[in-house]
Amino acid sequence: ADHTSFHIGGRAKRFVVARTEAEVLDEVKRADEAGEPLLVLSGGSNLLIGDEGFAGTVVKIVTRGIEAEVSGCGGAIVTVQAGEPWDAFVASTIEQEWSGIEALSGIPGAVGSTPVQNVGAYGSDVSQTVYRVRTLDRLTGEFRTFTAWECAFSYRDSVFKSSRMPDGGPTGRFVVLEVTFQFTLGSLSQPIRYAELARRLGVEVGQRCPSVQVREA
């Protein structure tokens, strides 16, 4: 219960906090080889666990790290570990004047869960800035990197959400390890697409405004 946004539910048979990528790989492999049910958390938002708990292994990913390559023509290519808190990352992009996800402020959870659900708000969604996603393929035990196109994003859906394991467990075939984003440079937001947000900001739909104002709205 302490590890979900709803703060309800029973205990797991085994609960592990993975602070490094190596720990994530080891724990996922251990559970899969043992044939145990596996639940991977990278934030625990919008997750309901019954009072009976979870009869398997829960791996909570809390990996940290942000690496950026910035150029005047290519913008900012930013690779983020799956366990980084999402809203703190959004705040950091605004501070760095990287434009693209300012409208997704206030969404709970961690970076690794955002491409799975293709999270969105106010007419924006994360697929608009995802450059690539690096994962562990549980079926093959190998790393697999997806381009934005290969992620098969649609409304609140992706290949990561739709690709299941044969046992049909709660965690899918691909465990997200890191997400790379591409941002434009500057202190102005992307064009405001959502009418209500535009009204609050005092601009027309399609106009830009300071990213910090979008976050505060």
Language-model-detected regions and their locations in the chain:
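Anion-binding (especially nucleotide phosphate/pyrophosphate-binding) glycine-rich loop
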Residues: 2-139
